[in-house]
């Protein structure tokens, strides 16, 4: 792919000119703020840059590039913004490099050499003779209509029969004749362009040579490639139409031409051949092929002869592109359509990738669900096997279990301790201190329940707050003496200590102290001598427990304090 500059009226492309003379730089698509600045500078309507869009280095100032070695490629600064766009137009207008300009210039030189083949009058003119051109042209304007057969009457006759006109012209009129020849050559060059544009406009988009507007609209399959190849022709032809290679005529030549026009329209048809006839009503080059001409004045007969001659000779494709102003606009519009189609194609590809990604995720989820279903199926099969294996023991188990699964009713004896029932979890973690131990924290889970008997069942299970490893364990029963508030707390611990504590319950507070303590023979020292516990339900509905103890080496000291939050009733 050949890299081309995306700026309007810029035909720089890769491989054109000297190496490293022009460098190309991509649009900053990832930097939105800088991209907006670039787009404002380029000033292209209905156009979106892609990763294949470039700007050449001629649109940037010298301070926009980073300092590098001479043999290294140019590198734009992160803040560089294009700002030079009018200089490129001046460059083309001054000396340019378009193929159409070379062709027109070559044609002018050919006509000049043909006009001055028999005599060297134009080459031997001095500066003093050139100064005489203006007064001589005025004399030519005041000449009588009887001399219409002379070269001054029909400029076409000058280009067709230069030898005869030079013989009939006196020597003192050499300078006006030379200037008239140059004017005829310029008018002939303009007439060629006007002839091509008028033939394209009169044919309504299709002339007798077989070239129509349909030639510029290829089938949809290769539209983008065709539009990309015609993009350079569009800009070059547009530049040629805006700035023709023929220099402007001086004011005196224009006056001479306007004076000659009414004379040549009436008498010079028979004397001038149709191949060299000139038109006096030029048509605007920017007119579209389908639009009607704005000038409705009748055309001279010379122009009619010229149109017949132009229809008889087929034109080349380059002349059609240069003359048909609507074709270039069509190419520009198709070029923007091409880029929009590419952009839509990239968006479709992106959407396809996202859909494929989502389909892959959905497939993995389905596989996980199928694996989970298979695991559930296996568990159900194992459960059925266990049920079948336990069938012989069902009559025996049914005799042990109660006939109904309803929870038992609370015994009225333990009603004063009903506020302790439920499952409790520590919140926050409990704190443990003792003079012979390092301070520590722990988590604890408490279950206090009943089975309808005049007692409560309890279990205390503590865990490490970080590793959640089991620590202290104890379980037992809480009994009340009927018709009193005396309470007995019987506990067995995993440290090998069994104790019986007794106390009283007052409202929602229970205080007990050790009555007897027993331990295994290999229990660790120092041995616990006395323990006190205090349970209290605070105003927030949380259960608090405080434990104090005395050993053989330490007096009664607070050992544990923890607060529980009720999880289940």
From Swiss-Prot:
Instruction: Report the EC number(s), separated by commas if there are several.
Output: 5.99.-.-
Is Cytoplasm one of the keywords? yes
Which SUPFAM superfamilies does the UniProt record give?
Glucocorticoid receptor-like (DNA-binding domain), Lipocalins
Give the catalytic activity.
peroxynitrite = nitrate
Where is this chain's protein located in or outside the cell?
Cytoplasm; Nucleus
Q: Say which enzyme class the record assigns.
A: isomerase
Q: Pfam families annotated for this entry? A: THAP, THAP4_heme-bd
GO CC annotations? cytosol; nucleoplasm
- Bias class Polar residues marks the residues at 121-130, 265-279
Q: Which note does the record give on the cofactor? A: Binds 1 heme b group per subunit, that coordinates a highly solvent-exposed Fe(III) atom.
Positions of the region Disordered? 83-219, 235-312
Keyword Nucleus among record annotations:
yes
GO molecular function list: DNA binding; heme binding; identical protein binding; nitric oxide binding; peroxynitrite isomerase activity; zinc ion binding
Residues bearing Phosphoserine are: 159, 234
The UniProt keyword set, sorted, is: Cytoplasm, DNA-binding, Heme, Iron, Isomerase, Metal-binding, Nucleus, Phosphoprotein, Zinc, Zinc-finger
Q: What does this protein do?
A: Heme-binding protein able to scavenge peroxynitrite and to protect free L-tyrosine against peroxynitrite-mediated nitration, by acting as a peroxynitrite isomerase that converts peroxynitrite to nitrate. Therefore, this protein likely plays a role in peroxynitrite sensing and in the detoxification of reactive nitrogen and oxygen species (RNS and ROS, respectively). Is able to bind nitric oxide (NO) in vitro, but may act as a sensor of peroxynitrite levels in vivo, possibly modulating the transcriptional activity residing in the N-terminal region.
Summarize the subunit comment.
Homodimer.
Q: What is known of its domains?
A: The C-terminal nitrobindin region coordinates a heme and bears the isomerase activity. The N-terminal zinc finger domain likely binds DNA and may be involved in transcriptional regulation.
Q: What is this protein called?
A: Peroxynitrite isomerase THAP4
Phylogenetic placement of the source organism: Eukaryota, Metazoa, Chordata, Craniata, Vertebrata
Q: State the gene name recorded for this protein.
A: Thap4
């Amino acid at each position: 792919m050949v890299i081309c500059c995306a700026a309007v009226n810029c035909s720089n492309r890769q491989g054109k000119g000297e190496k490293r003379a022009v460098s190309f730089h991509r649009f900053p698509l990832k930097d939105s703020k800088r991209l907006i600045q670039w787009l404002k500078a380029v000033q292209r309507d209905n156009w979106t840059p892609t990763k294949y869009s470039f700007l050449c280095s001629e649109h940037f100032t010298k301070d926009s590039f980073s300092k590098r070695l001479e043999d290294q490629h140019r590198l734009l600064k992160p803040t560089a913004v294009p700002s030079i766009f009018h200089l490129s137009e001046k460059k083309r207008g001054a000396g340019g490099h378009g193929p159409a300009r070379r062709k027109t210039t070559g044609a002018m030189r050919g006509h000049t050499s043909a006009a001055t083949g028999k005599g060297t009058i134009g080459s031997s003119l001095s500066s003093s003779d050139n100064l005489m051109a203006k007064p001589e042209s005025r004399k030519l304007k005041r000449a009588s209509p009887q001399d219409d057969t002379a070269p001054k009457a029909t400029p076409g006759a000058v280009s067709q029969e230069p030898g005869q006109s030079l013989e009939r012209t006196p020597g003192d009129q050499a300078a006006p004749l030379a200037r008239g020849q140059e004017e005829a050559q310029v008018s002939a060059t303009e007439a060629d362009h006007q002839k091509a544009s008028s033939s394209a406009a009169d044919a309504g988009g299709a002339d007798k040579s077989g070239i129509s507007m349909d030639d510029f609209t290829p089938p949809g399959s290769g539209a983008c490639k065709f539009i990309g190849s015609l993009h350079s022709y569009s800009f070059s032809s547009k530049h040629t139409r805006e700035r023709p290679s023929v220099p402007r005529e001086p004011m005196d030549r224009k006056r001479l031409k306007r004076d000659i026009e009414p004379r040549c329209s009436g008498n010079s048809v028979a004397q001038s051949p149709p191949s060299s006839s000139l038109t006096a009503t030029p048509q605007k080059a920017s007119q579209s092929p389908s639009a009607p001409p704005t000038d409705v004045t009748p055309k001279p007969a010379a122009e009619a002869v010229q149109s017949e001659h132009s229809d008889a000779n087929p034109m080349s494709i380059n002349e059609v592109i240069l003359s048909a102003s609507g074709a270039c606009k069509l190419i520009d519009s198709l070029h923007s359509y091409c880029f929009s189609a590419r952009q839509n194609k990239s968006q479709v590809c992106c959407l396809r990738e996202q859909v494929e990604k989502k389909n892959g995720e959905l497939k993995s989820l389905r596989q996980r669900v199928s694996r989970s279903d298979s695991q559930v199926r296996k568990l159900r099969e194992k459960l059925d096997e266990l049920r079948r294996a336990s069938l012989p023991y069902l009559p025996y188990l049914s005799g042990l279990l109660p006939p109904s699964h309803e929870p038992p009713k609370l015994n009225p004896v333990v009603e004063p301790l009903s506020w302790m029932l439920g499952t409790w979890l520590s919140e926050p973690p409990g704190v443990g201190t003792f003079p012979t131990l390092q301070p520590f924290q722990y988590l604890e889970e408490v279950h206090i329940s009943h089975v309808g008997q005049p007692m409560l069942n309890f279990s205390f299970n503590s865990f490490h707050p970080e590793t959640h490893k089991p620590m202290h364990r104890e379980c037992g029963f809480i009994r009340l003496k009927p018709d009193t508030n005396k309470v007995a707390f019987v506990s067995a611990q995993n440290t090998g200590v069994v104790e019986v504590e007794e106390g009283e319950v007052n409202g929602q507070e229970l205080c007990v102290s050790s009555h007897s303590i027993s331990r295994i023979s290999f229990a660790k020292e120092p041995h616990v001598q006395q323990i006190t516990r205090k349970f209290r339900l605070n105003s927030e509905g949380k259960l608090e427990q405080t434990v104090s103890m005395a050993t053989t080496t330490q007096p009664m000291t607070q050992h544990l304090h923890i607060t529980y939050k009720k999880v289940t009733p």
